[in-house]
Amino acid sequence: MSLPEHSPLGKPSAYKTEYDASLLFPIPRQPKRTEIGLPEGKPVPFFGVDIWNAYELSWLNLKGKPQVALASFIIPSDTPNIIESKSFKLYLNSFNQTRIASPEALQQLLHHDLSEATGGTVQVRLVTEADLGKQKMGELDGLLLDRLDIEVDRYEPAPELLSADQQESPVEETLVSHLLKSNCLVTGQPDWGSVQIRYVGAPINQEGLLKYLISFRNHNEFHEQCVERIFMDVMRECKPVKLAVYARYTRRGGLDINPFRTNFNTAWPDNKRNARQ
């Protein structure tokens, strides 16, 4: 099993400039899911995707002329593995001096390698120079929790802060906070994010929810793992009928990671970059 501490994170790395798929370092999802009460071999109570965006992708055409593009990768949450982010960066950089016939050929190669590493089917989209000006930005929709004037003293995940008034009629609500911060599982480097929680069910106590989200501030876990922990804690403590959790994290090493988890059928998020990304 690939363990996070064996990944390139926190270690000096030689940057290869010619294509090398072996740089990708997959990490199994299951151990962290076991931690949040999801045993191996049983269905998980959510589905979704991890949306990655790469802003530093370059290669050479067959004449040796550099090419650049943005790339997005949609990794289903039911793949057995995630990709450790530094290894992803090193892999993408390995294309820098690699001659490739066309953007389409690169897209096919990325699809193959990432699908192999994750154990599923990864969608790949390239945005070449001609379309860069068409890229749009947008913020997460929803009622801003950060408006609340609260006192905070918990900085490790505290699901007991969550509650919902089960005596009230169900509501449909979308809540947003830009105060999510966690830390890399291996290096402890800060990860900054915005999070959107959509639900149908008993009204969730908003002050408690904001305190809970802030409680991740000193917590060490990868982005995907944090979002699944949030999903499970809200489900257990607040018991919504429907729940979707979406986080957009700021980029590091030219990559941002945006996990989405839901228990009801809905369109995947539209992947608009927000102002902090």
Swiss-Prot record:
E.C. no: 1.7.1.13
Entry-linked Pfam families: QueF, QueF_N
Example GO biological process: queuosine biosynthetic process
Gene Ontology terms, MF aspect: preQ1 synthase activity
Catalytic activity of the protein: 7-aminomethyl-7-carbaguanine + 2 NADP(+) = 7-cyano-7-deazaguanine + 2 NADPH + 3 H(+)
Signal peptide extent: none
Keyword Cytoplasm: yes
Keyword Ubl conjugation: no
Active site: 184 (thioimide intermediate), 191 (proton donor)
Location in or out of the cell: Cytoplasm
Gene Ontology CC entries for this record: cytoplasm
Keywords from the named record: Cytoplasm, NADP, Oxidoreductase, Queuosine biosynthesis
Residue positions binding NADPH: 85-86, 252-253
Pathway: tRNA modification; tRNA-queuosine biosynthesis
Binding sites annotated in the UniProt record for substrate: 83-85, 223-224
Superkingdom in the source lineage: Bacteria
Assembly description: Homodimer.
PANTHER family: NADPH-DEPENDENT 7-CYANO-7-DEAZAGUANINE REDUCTASE
The name this protein goes by in its record: NADPH-dependent 7-cyano-7-deazaguanine reductase
